[in-house]
Amino acid sequence: MGVVHDVWLVTKELLEATALPWPSEEREERLAAVDRLLLEREELLRKLRPPYSEEEQELGREIIVWNQEIEARLLRVCEEIRRDLRMTGAKRQANARYVHPYEQPLSFDGMFYDKRR
């Protein structure tokens, strides 16, 4: 089976590595593992050459199904990271407003606005 079987094995490892949920404490290690597996699989995919036997075609179909699941899981992780970044930014702004309350006016109520200038 050769290269197709190797791609299948790496894809299976990748599927297991992307299993949800991803606790924020483990996120860095899991992202590093996923990145390593993706690079390994990319190298193997470059070595793929037809013709494929019936068994290799069956493995290929399974790889395609797994790949769709992996993509969906990675998109969810990406959304979690984006949400965490937004929350961190909001917390930082709220903390800055609390520490320095008069640096930026919160509202412009009662301020005179000259339309001509």
Curated annotation (Swiss-Prot):
GO terms for biological process: bacterial-type flagellum organization. It is found in: Cytoplasm, Cytosol. GO terms for cellular component: cytosol. Keywords: Bacterial flagellum biogenesis, Chaperone, Cytoplasm. May act as an export chaperone for the filament capping protein FliD. Belongs to the bacillales FliT family. This is Flagellar protein FliT. It comes from Geobacillus kaustophilus (strain HTA426). The lineage of its organism: Bacteria, Bacillati, Bacillota, Bacilli, Bacillales. The gene is fliT.
